[in-house]
Design a protein with these regions (language model features):
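N-terminal "assembly arms/tails" that initiate or stabilize quaternary assembly
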Residues: 1-82, 218, 248-251, 292, ...
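Intrinsically disordered, low-complexity coil segments
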Residues: 100-109, 138-146, 150-155, 176, ...
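Short secondary-structure junctions and interdomain/linker hinges
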Residues: 17, 21-25, 29, 124, ...
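Internal mixed-charge
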Residues: 215-312
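Long, contiguous amphipathic alpha-helices that act as assembly "spine/axial" helices in icosahedral shell
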Residues: 76-145, 177, 182, 253-282
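Extended, solvent-exposed, turn-rich assembly/linker loops in the middle of proteins
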Residues: 135-215
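Helix N-cap / beta->alpha transition motif
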Residues: 88-99, 184-188, 223-226, 232-233, ...
Length: 366
C-alpha cells in the first residue's frame, strides 16, 4: 500500500512540476525551443513558426502564355514533419533506507524524486530538440557561419565575440533581428563573459545545470552542457522564435515490489514519448523509412545532419487545361486538352527556417 501511495504522489508531483518549468523556460528562452503539450504547441507554432514569407509579392507577366509556371511559396509545416521518440526514467532501486523514509514521509520523498526526474526529463527534451536543430541547420550550407580567425597573446581559446552574434544573424538579412536566442555550453559561456563585456547580463531561468541568461538587448543565452553534447564542441546555435518544437505526450510512472530473488526488491521507473520538429526542415524519407514501424527513433537518428533536408514543400499534379494549341494548322489540333508544364518544387528561403549554426574558431598566438 505504501508503494501505491508513493507512486500516486510521485506521478502527481512530476506532472505538476514539468509543465510549470516548461512554461517558464519557454518564456525565458524567447520561445526558440518550445516545450509543451500538443494543444499548447499548436497555438504557439501557428503564431510563431510561419513568420515572414520571403518574397511573398513578386512581379507578374500579364502577357505570359498559358501554362507558364509560377514559383510557389512555402508555409512552415513543423508539426506535420515531427519525429516521435521514446525515453524512460530509471528503473531505480528503492533501498531499505529509502523505503523506511517513504513509510515515514511519503510526500517529502516523492517531492525530492520528482524534482530530480523533472530536471532529467527537461534536459532530455532540450538535448533532443537542440541536437535535432543543430543537425537540421548543419544540412543547409546557407545557414552556417564560421567565426573568422583571431590572434591573441595566448592562443587556443575558443569563445564568441560580441561581433559574432550580429554577423551570424546577418544570414537572415533584414530578418536578422528574429534571432535572439543563443545556445552554447558552459565553457563557451565562461570564456565569453571572461573576455567580452556583455551588457547587463542576468539570470532569468535555472533548473539544475540549465541556465538562461539575458542581456540589455533582449537576447537570451541558454547554457547547458547536456544540450551542448548534442551540438558538439565549439558550436553555437542562434534560433528564431518557434525554431524547434518538442511536443510532450504524457508520462507513466510505476513503483512496485518484485519477488523471486534472494531479497524482495522495490523499484520505480517512468516512461514517456515526445515529438521533435524543426522549422523549415524535415527528416529525409531515406532516414524515416527503415525506422518507422520497426523501432523507436533514437537521439542518434535525429542528431545526424545527413538525415535532414530542407522542407521544400510539395507540388500538385500538373493540371490539364483546354486551350487552343495552335493558331494555324488542322482544325483537329484545336481545342485539345493539353497538360501544362510540370510545376517547380517550391524553394524555402533561409528566413523561413530555424536559425543559424555558428562554428567557433580557436585563437592563434601572436
Amino acid at each position: 500500500m505504501t508503494l501505491t501511495v508513493f507512486q500516486r504522489k510521485l506521478v502527481t508531483a512530476v506532472t505538476q512540476m514539468i509543465p510549470d518549468n516548461l512554461n517558464v523556460f519557454n518564456a525565458a528562452a524567447n520561445g526558440a525551443v518550445v516545450l509543451g503539450t500538443g494543444e499548447v504547441l499548436k497555438d504557439v507554432i501557428e503564431k510563431m513558426s510561419v513568420g515572414l514569407i520571403a518574397n511573398l509579392v513578386t512581379d507578374r507577366n500579364a502577357y505570359a502564355p498559358v501554362g507558364t509556371p509560377a514559383t510557389a511559396k512555402v508555409l512552415a509545416r513543423m508539426l506535420t514533419n515531427s519525429v516521435n521518440l521514446s525515453a524512460k526514467v530509471g528503473p531505480v532501486a528503492i533501498t531499505k533506507a529509502m523505503m523506511a523514509k517513504i513509510e515515514t514521509n511519503v510526500n517529502s520523498v516523492a517531492a525530492e524524486i520528482a524534482a530530480q526526474a523533472t530536471q532529467a526529463i527537461m534536459l532530455h527534451y532540450l538535448k533532443a530538440g537542440i541536437g535535432a536543430g543543430k543537425a537540421a541547420i548543419e544540412s543547409n550550407e546557407a545557414a552556417k557561419y564560421t567565426q573568422p580567425a583571431r590572434v591573441d597573446g595566448v592562443g587556443g581559446r575558443t569563445f564568441p565575440t560580441l561581433a559574432d552574434f550580429p554577423l551570424a544573424a546577418s544570414k537572415f538579412g533584414d530578418q536578422a533581428s528574429l534571432i535572439k536566442s543563443w545556445f552554447m555550453d558552459g565553457v563557451t559561456w565562461a570564456n565569453f563573459i571572461a573576455y567580452q563585456a556583455l551588457p547587463s547580463a542576468e539570470q532569468v531561468f535555472a533548473i539544475g545545470d540549465l541556465q538562461v541568461m539575458g542581456d540589455g538587448l533582449g537576447r537570451r543565452f541558454i547554457i547547458s552542457d547536456a544540450a551542448a553534447d548534442a551540438m558538439g564542441t565549439g558550436n553555437m546555435l542562434g534560433l528564431v522564435p518557434g525554431a524547434v518544437a518538442v511536443t510532450t505526450n504524457g508520462l507513466d510512472m510505476l513503483a512496485q515490489e518484485k519477488g523471486g530473488n534472494e531479497n524482495i526488491e522495490r523499484w520505480w521507473q517512468g516512461e514517456f514519448d515526445f515529438n521533435v520538429a524543426v522549422k523549415g526542415y524535415r527528416l529525409k524519407a531515406s532516414a524515416r523509412t527503415p525506422i518507422e514501424g520497426v523501432r523507436s527513433f533514437k537521439l542518434d537518428d535525429i542528431t545526424t545532419s545527413a538525415n535532414w533536408e530542407l522542407d521544400q514543400g510539395q507540388v500538385d499534379n500538373a493540371p490539364a487545361t483546354v486551350q487552343d494549341v495552335g493558331a494555324v494548322g488542322d482544325v483537329d489540333t484545336k481545342g485539345r486538352r493539353k497538360t501544362q508544364a510540370a510545376q517547380a518544387v517550391p524553394t524555402r528561403h533561409i528566413k523561413e527556417t530555424a536559425g543559424v549554426l555558428v562554428t567557433l574558431t580557436a585563437t592563434t598566438a601572436s
